[in-house]
Amino acid sequence: MDANKQKALELAMKQIDKQFGKGSLVKLSDKDIEPIAAIPTGSFGLDLALGIGGIPKGRITEIYGPESSGKTTLALSIIAQAQKDGGVAAFIDAEHALDVIYAKHIGVDVDNLLVSQPDYGEQALEIVETLARSGAVDIIVIDSVAALTPKAEIEGNMGDAQVGVQARLMSQALRKLTAAIHKMNTTVVFINQIRMKIGMMGYGSPETTTGGNALKFYSSVRLDVRRIATLKQADKEVGNRVKVKVVKNKVAPPFRIAEFDIMFGKGISREGELLDYGVKLDIIDKSGAWFSYGATRLGQGKENAKEYLKSHPELAQEIEQKIKDALGVELSHMIEAIEKDEDELNLKGE
């Protein structure tokens, strides 16, 4: 840069610092760039799919899917993981449907969980903003966007047309929230529902999420949660097999998929993931219906093997460490492959 431009830039930076405060504009070389911190999800398969070990701190995450697919369970699992690391969590129960006993079974410290059941959407989002600006709360979960009913709609008559009111409310709230949560490093998770597009014909998905497009744009991560199978034990339904697709990811490559079991009354099955990844990585041997780890027979059938691992935590921990080591090697190979592809593209571009 020539001397005149350098001088003009320095003057502009001084003026900006004077007007907006020191550090309003800095060179990246003068600033320490730290890796993106994350809150684990409770599923190490999903943590791997997210690329950074969980959902990013200080950002917005959207979890959406059909009813009874496991959205709230996943969100509560994230809260439990944040609390384990000493974090403060808040749950904005716009649906007025929080099951405290289930949350406790999942691992949530319900005694220290902040809960609000707002009367209307504006109140809910004001509470979220106040908590975020306080800097004292690490994670806020809003359940759900569809239940954030604008005050005008509540006070109006049944059948009154309220076109786009909720979308405008969300757009305004997210504009205000984004800067606050980034500055205070507060993680905000919105749970959302699916609706069918009216008059949808031809190509594209007929599904959409509620609350307009603003949340899609402001979210750093979007997770599509689907129930793909019902788990049974002796003809009794005991849980669901769930598939989560990382539809959007601003902090790592998107479109990765994770599958795990959600057990009724218990939440995400850690033992189920140990068996799935253990078999996939040849750490656990599966012969017919039998699961074995070295000379140790874990059980006949997945549910029995899961129970064995649950009653032998030291063995489960040993298997988990081997899986993480194997996945770490696999991930490093993936990163090397991506970097190699990028180098080749750069060479072609030159």
From Swiss-Prot:
Keywords: ATP-binding, Cytoplasm, DNA damage, DNA recombination, DNA repair, DNA-binding, Nucleotide-binding, SOS response. PROSITE patterns: RECA_1, RECA_2, RECA_3. It is found in: Cytoplasm. It comes from the Bacteria. Gene3D superfamilies: P-loop containing nucleotide triphosphate hydrolases (3.40.50.300). ATP binds at G65, P66, E67, S68, S69, G70, K71, T72. InterPro entries: AAA+_ATPase, DNA_recomb/repair_RecA, DNA_recomb/repair_RecA_CS, P-loop_NTPase, RecA-like_C, RecA-like_N, RecA_ATP-bd, RecA_C_sf. GO terms for molecular function: ATP binding; ATP hydrolysis activity; ATP-dependent DNA damage sensor activity; damaged DNA binding; single-stranded DNA binding. Coiled coil: none annotated. One of its GO terms (cellular component) is cytosol. SUPFAM superfamilies: P-loop containing nucleoside triphosphate hydrolases, RecA protein, C-terminal domain. GO terms for biological process: DNA recombination; DNA repair; SOS response. Can catalyze the hydrolysis of ATP in the presence of single-stranded DNA, the ATP-dependent uptake of single-stranded DNA by duplex DNA, and the ATP-dependent hybridization of homologous single-stranded DNAs. It interacts with LexA causing its activation and leading to its autocatalytic cleavage. Belongs to the RecA family. PANTHER family: MITOCHONDRIAL DNA REPAIR PROTEIN RECA HOMOLOG-RELATED, RECA. This is Protein RecA.
